A protein has these predicted regions:
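The feature captures the beta-strand-to-loop junction immediately N-terminal to the Walker
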Residues: 35-37
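Conserved structural motif at the start of ABC-family nucleotide-binding domains
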Residues: 4-6, 19
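Helical segment within the ABC ATPase nucleotide-binding domain
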Residues: 159-171
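Catalytic Walker B motif of ABC-type/P-loop ATPase nucleotide-binding domains
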Residues: 144-148
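Helix-to-loop junction immediately C-terminal to a conserved catalytic motif
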Residues: 50
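Conserved ABC ATPase "signature" region
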Residues: 92, 100-116
């Protein structure tokens, strides 16, 4: 099933073309990576799909699944984490189901138990990245957009995140 379709999308900033005639289809359960040089427009495309940025021409469609608690989960550069709250409090604030078992499950899957109750301002870059990933997957979204999800992670954390991504893709 197609979840996102992008057709002939073009984005300009001033006279500079950032995205030109981009078309793609994202299907349920698929893992897709955008690869390109720095400044190629990968993050810009993600922001357009998320609705954070406008575009000049083309169109895109996001299919809403009624069974999904949330349509889109996202991890973009500098995830919006409240620094004076604990990681757990950040997750609790953003948990649509209000079911703490959802939080406990994602914390366990990402091996965050040791520090989840500490203030987020004390987290290392890797710990903040894992919290951002937990936020992205927390509400069982229909699809997830991750911008450089392995950034700042140690090898064990990379394995944990990769396993979570593959598991969620298999669950469809």
């Amino acid at each position: 099933m197609d979840v996102v379709t992008v057709e002939h999308l073009t984005k300009k900033i001033g006279n500079k073309t950032i995205l030109e005639d981009i078309s793609l289809t994202l299907k349920r359960g698929h893992i897709v990576g955008l690869v390109g040089a720095n400044g190629a427009g990968k993050t810009t495309l993600m922001k357009v799909i998320l609705g954070y940025s406008s575009f000049q021409s083309g169109n895109f469609n996001v299919i809403k699944n009624q069974d999904s608690k949330s349509n889109i989960g996202a991890l973009i550069e500098n995830p919006g984490i409240y620094p004076f709250m604990s990681g757990y409090e950040n997750l609790k604030l953003l948990n649509e189901s209000k079911n703490t078992q959802d939080i406990d499950k994602i914390v366990s899957q990402l091996n965050m138990d040791e520090y989840i109750h500490k203030k987020a301002k004390t987290y290392s870059l890797g710990m903040k990245q894992k919290l951002g990933i937990a936020i992205a997957f927390l509400n069982d979204p229909q699809f997830v957009i991750l911008d450089e999800p392995m950034n700042g992670l140690d090898p064990k954390a990379v394995r944990d995140v990769r396993e979570l991504i593959v598991q969620k893709a298999q669950e469809g």
